[in-house]
From Swiss-Prot:
Keyword terms of this UniProt record: Antenna complex, Chromophore, Membrane, Phycobilisome, Thylakoid
Pfam family, one: Carot_N
Membrane listed as a keyword: yes
Organism annotation: Nostoc sp. (strain PCC 7120 / SAG 25.82 / UTEX 2576)
Role this protein plays: Might act as a photo-protectant, protecting against damage induced by excess light via a process known as non-photochemical quenching (NPQ).
Boundaries of every OCP N-terminal domain copy: 21-171
Principal location class: membrane
Protein name per its UniProtKB record: Orange carotenoid-binding domain-containing protein
């Protein structure tokens, strides 16, 4: 599993020189400029490092039972297939799993990624390699995310995971 990206560096320095009120939009913009693997790494680190505070907000408002079948389906896959599913979701590739994910509510998508990170920690889903070191750009996005207040963090995470997958009902 290879995670690399330095492509968003210049956008980062420009994006985070903006006022605090624009911090949410800037963080989202730079996150979306990361490579797919770096996006997945940032989500994993965000959920594992900040998961204790994210969990109540995500699962409290979500109907996670709607995503349980999808999570169980992913658990049954090989690690290579699991990684491909996550990449397909982030890249908005039109697959059966991406379409199933696409019909979930934004809060359920937020909870889905939290549960996926928990499954990674428990070894049911392909983990981030133990020797993995997040890219400079990914690290900057993660630090920017940590610098936001709780409500802003949830807004950023909800927006980035809401944009993943494919909405089968969209025109």
């Amino acid at each position: 599993m290879t995670f690399t990206s330095d492509s968003a560096s210049t956008r980062f320095s420009q994006a985070f020189g903006i006022q605090t009120g624009d911090a949410v939009a800037s963080t989202i913009t730079v996150f979306q400029a990361l490579s797919i693997d770096d996006q997945l790494a940032v989500l994993w680190y965000a959920y594992t490092e900040m998961g204790r505070s994210i969990t109540p907000a995500a699962t409290g408002a979500a109907r996670l039972q709607l995503a349980e079948g999808l999570l169980n389906q992913i658990k049954q896959m090989s690690h290579a297939e699991q990684l491909q599913v996550m990449r397909d979701l982030a890249a908005k590739n039109n697959t059966q799993v991406s379409r199933s994910y696409g019909i979930l509510s934004n809060n359920t998508k937020l909870a889905f990624w939290y549960e996926l990170s928990e499954l990674m920690v428990k070894g049911f889903v392909v983990p981030v390699p133990t020797d993995y070191k997040i890219s400079r750009d990914g690290s900057q996005v993660l630090e920017a995310l940590k610098g936001l207040d709780f409500g802003q963090q949830i807004t950023v995470l909800r927006k980035v995971v809401a944009d993943m997958g494919v909405d089968p009902l969209a025109d």
